[in-house]
């Protein structure tokens, strides 16, 4: 499995395979695809920048137009559908192997489908990912390896350390403070960059 792609199956994986190259050409990365509903489903696309900075509402608009156009052409979904595009946010989901490595040292929560040593839910410090497993150091100091292919959900926990790290990622290139200068960059609130109106594509007509 490509460490740059989220772990998905079925129709979600099919849509991801179509969308990911489009985002890459625009300088973005696919974080998550979720298709909700059966009749007139909503296709939720979560993305971030390839350089690690969070996307803005304007980015969501651009992604929505580009992704909507290619989905119209490839037509993976029968009937009418609605497209929603949002930023991954600060306390983002961990859907790719690279996420576990990129955010190593930060607190996260994860839940697997099949119990490991009698439990499905885990909370601890990210230690990275290797060979299809994400590693956590739990509160008692023990380490656990969770199969990414069996991950039900995993996401970062909002902490002061994560907010500070996100503030650095949100800077534009060349925007870092000079040595000795106070960093006054504020982290975006949860869901920043989400575009419920501009990033929402009207349902297309049924063929």
UniProtKB/Swiss-Prot annotation:
It is found in: Cytoplasm. GO terms for cellular component: cytosol. It comes from the Bacteria. Residues 171-207 are annotated as: Disordered. Coiled coil: none annotated. Keywords: Cytoplasm, Ribosome biogenesis. Residues 197-207 have a biased composition (Basic residues). GO terms for biological process: ribosomal small subunit assembly; translation. InterPro entries: Ribosome_maturation_RimP, RimP_C, RimP_C_sf, RimP_N, RimP_N_sf. Required for maturation of 30S ribosomal subunits. Belongs to the RimP family. This is Ribosome maturation factor RimP.
